[in-house]
Amino acid sequence: MLGALLLSGAVHAAVQPLDSVVAIVDNDVIMKSQMDQRVREVQQTIAKRGSGVPPAADLQPQVLDRLILENLQLQMGERSGIRVSDDELNQAIGTIAQRNNMSVEQFRAALAHDGLSYEDAREQVRREMIISRVRQRRVAERIQVSEQEVKNFLASDQGKAQLSEEFHLANILIATPDSASSDAIQAAAVKAKSIYDQLKKGADFAKIAATTSSSENALEGGDMGWRKAAQLPPPFGDMLSSMPIGDVTPPARTPGGFIILKLLEKRGGQGQAQMRDEVHVRHILIKPSEIRSEEATKLLAQKIYERIENGEDFATLAKSFSEDPGSALNGGDLNWVDPNSLVPEFRDVMSSTPQGELSKPFKTAYGWHVLEVLGRRATDATGQARDQQALSVLRNRKYDEELQTWLRQIRDEAYVEIKLPGATQAAQ
């Protein structure tokens, strides 16, 4: 959504009247004006892609479900003390402007020219960043890929053939809950087959995705962006290399339901780097939580930094305080790392810290860090780069599946009461 901020007309200058509640979501509500505004945004996005624009009534259930999931994640972020500072927000806005080949001032002017509010745009970006950090903590951090999985993947025909090719895809997901009965699964299969038949006869993929798909990207016409084939569920791996652009795959059952893919574009892989800079670094991570505020977390990181500066042992303090389970027991040692594999905030601080010196406390999506650079080197990374690429596609594949499962879980566990006239009640 962020990358399409300008194109989609996603932020409106005029504040719409809050006329009625359409959903109660745990401790918050969603107003009809919010839903109506999002429906208009989706219609504008679909229209700019040249697809047929669905009626507002057809989009309302999908839009409301998206707003409910966003609301639940924002509430989680609030309870967990996740905040986005103005400096972080300014940096994100700068990145969005750069992606649109603009300066920030040009970006603001372009928004104003289109009758859009820069202040509303900032708040939309802030919400997206909070949701991203919630997902990082709740989903991405618990995904594990073993060395054996990487080796097996690289040795497989799928791994050898697919690491070098990328596909721009759109998808339609007909979801099946974990507890779905055999009749419900059969009904989903029939629905997916019916949609596939419509698509083969020339039906508008983006329009059908926006009105029927349960996928996270349904309201973007199902657009998934660029993916390695290996990142996708196994049934699709062998189909995509030989599939003509514009074609769709038959429905395939996955853990989340029945998926149909459309191939939008195809491109060859990037060349592998032969040499790579690596940094030997150790760090201490302190995370905010429901019982420790952002400010208290920052203060604790500052105190640890001062203790190290005053001569206390870094490794000992890391074992006592660090909340990074992968490095705490090793005294915070991350060993030799590729800077490009790290989140930008960590990478930038590490790059600017001289060898043998300590950084001041700094913040990333994971929490507050103190790091020490122990060494730098250039290494032949041909094999390591391929291992890292395999690790990345396996993690992304698991993340996509885990995210859908987690979103269903938080939706099922929440109290949600739908008050939209004519909608099915979904209170829990």
Curated annotation (Swiss-Prot):
- An example Pfam family from this entry, by short name, is Rotamase
Name this protein carries in UniProt: Chaperone SurA
Annotated GO biological processes are: Gram-negative-bacterium-type cell outer membrane assembly; protein folding; protein stabilization
Please state every residue range assigned to the domain named PpiC: 164-265, 276-375
- What role does it play? Chaperone involved in the correct folding and assembly of outer membrane proteins. Recognizes specific patterns of aromatic residues and the orientation of their side chains, which are found more frequently in integral outer membrane proteins. May act in both early periplasmic and late outer membrane-associated steps of protein maturation.
Say which enzyme class the record assigns.
Answer: isomerase
What is the annotated localization of this protein? Periplasm
Q: Which reaction does it catalyse?
A: [protein]-peptidylproline (omega=180) = [protein]-peptidylproline (omega=0)
Is Chaperone given among the entry's keywords?
Answer: yes
Record's comment describing the protein's domains = The PPIase activity resides only in the second parvulin domain. The N-terminal region and the C-terminal tail are necessary and sufficient for the chaperone activity of SurA. The PPIase activity is dispensable for SurA to function as a chaperone. The N-terminal region and the C-terminal tail are also required for porin recognition.
Keyword Plastid among UniProt keywords: no
Q: Per its UniProt record, what HAMAP family does this chain match? A: Chaperone_SurA
Question: Which Enzyme Commission number(s) are listed?
Answer: 5.2.1.8
A molecular-function term among this protein's GO annotations: peptidyl-prolyl cis-trans isomerase activity
Native organism is: Pseudomonas syringae pv. tomato (strain ATCC BAA-871 / DC3000)
Q: Which GO terms describe its cellular component?
A: outer membrane-bounded periplasmic space
For this UniProt record, the keywords arranged alphabetically read as follows: Chaperone, Isomerase, Periplasm, Repeat, Rotamase, Signal
Residues in the signal sequence: 1-13
